[in-house]
A protein has these predicted regions:
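Short hydrophobic/aromatic beta-strand or adjacent loop that forms the aromatic wall/cage
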Residues: 37, 133-138
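Short amphipathic alpha-helix that is part of the acyltransferase structural core
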Residues: 1-27, 33-50, 63, 143-145, ...
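Conserved glycine-rich acetyl-CoA-binding loop
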Residues: 48, 63, 76-87, 99, ...
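Conserved active-site alpha-helix within GNAT-family acetyltransferase domains
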Residues: 98-102, 107-133
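Conserved beta-strand in the GNAT
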Residues: 39-41, 47-59, 66-74
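Conserved acetyl-CoA-binding loop-helix of GNAT-fold acetyltransferases
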Residues: 70, 75, 81-94, 105-106
């Protein structure tokens, strides 16, 4: 298994990693608009894409604070349960930390993301625009001071509003 930065030719192979075409279309739209801060793929021994994670800009209370949103994260069903999602997330967090980003937000299972160092964003008075997601909205600080004095609405790009 190899985890690497995505390249243009991977686009056609991504649909295999997603459960629905909506996620693949989201990635396509983000890429077309130059909004993927970092995209990583996991490939099998034959070079087929079997996992994917994207990070794109997120703003807090209308301000650019070097935060990114992590979505989508997907692993081909034949490769689930092998720690591939965890590896993709860790690789992304490491790279974003090296690039100087301050924090990463995501929506997902608190038990899974909690094991990866994410915390409920609500503990820091952070929220996203989608009602009923309070327990699923997570934040991971990359910079020690990323959450100092920061609170309010965290927004992903409008492309995410279709979900």
């Amino acid at each position: 298994m190899l985890i690497r930065v995505e390249i243009g030719i991977d686009a056609a192979l991504l649909r295999r990693a997603f459960e629905s075409d909506a996620e693949a279309q989201l990635v396509h739209d983000l890429r077309e608009d130059g909004l993927i801060t970092l995209g990583l793929v996991a490939t099998d021994d034959e070079g087929q894409v079997v996992g994917y994670v994207a990070f794109s800009p997120a703003i807090v209370q209308g301000e650019e604070l070097q935060w990114v949103g992590m979505a989508p994260l997907a692993v081909d069903e034949n490769y689930r349960g092998q720690g591939l999602a965890r590896q993709l997330v860790y690789e992304g967090l490491d790279s974003l930390n090296e690039f100087g980003y301050a924090a990463v937000v995501t929506l997902g299972d608190p038990a899974f993301y909690g094991r990866l160092g994410f915390e409920q964003a609500a503990h820091y008075d952070l929220r996203c625009r989608w009602p009923g997601t309070e327990s699923a909205f997570q934040v991971h600080r990359l910079a020690d001071d990323a959450l100092n004095g920061v609170n309010g609405l965290v927004e992903y790009h409008d492309h995410f509003n279709r979900f």
